[in-house]
Amino acid sequence: MATYGRYRGRNNQDLVEHLRRSRVIKSDRVFEVMSSVDRGKYLNTYSSVAYVDAPQGIGYGVTISAPHMHAYALELLEEKLRNGTRALDVGSGSGYLTACMALMMGPHGLAVGIDHIPELRALAEENIRLDHQELLNDGRVELVVGDGRLGYPSRGPYDAIHVGAAAKEMPQPLIDQLAPGGRLIVPMGPENSDQTLMQIDKTLDGKIKQRSLIGVVFVPLTDKERQYRRS
């Protein structure tokens, strides 16, 4: 996916149209939701780089992923993000992808964003309130503080789970919280080394199927104390 990086959009719509021209965005639904969710409102402090196709730091040693990676993840999960379904965004950070998922799931869906840094959970709420307040008002987004490595079983099972940081090993608690027919997207591999984006599907009879997708570079999925030290 590196060939798609570093494009500098004039605004959100210009960036999203570039991703469609580049065939990163393939479906109308992903195009429409990324047009609707303004990345600039999730990077208020860094507005000058909001529409650059590159990851950006948002504090506490974490980043908001590059737009092409958000588009790629949404395309992978698109068939699972339907009206009335449930999704979990692990390491929700700015709240951008949580909002996208919620909009794709319609008025009866639920997107749960989990982050173990309270300040990031508050940031996500502020950003979503600025951009799509109705998601909070209608209970379509729930933002919680917790260890995302353990998932959030009280709202599961989930039809779609996205992990925004690299896991060192297969995250079994998240697999356990997948609904039959559900899909998990997670980067896997050690910090500062080769990582692979993995697609993990749970069949309707509960079997697990894994698929390696592309090489990626993500910050590590780690504990709260270490993350504070990285900030």
At which residue positions do the language-model features occur?
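Class I SAM-dependent transferase core
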Residues: 1-88, 99-104, 120-130, 204, ...
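Conserved nucleotide-cofactor-binding alpha/beta core module
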Residues: 79-205
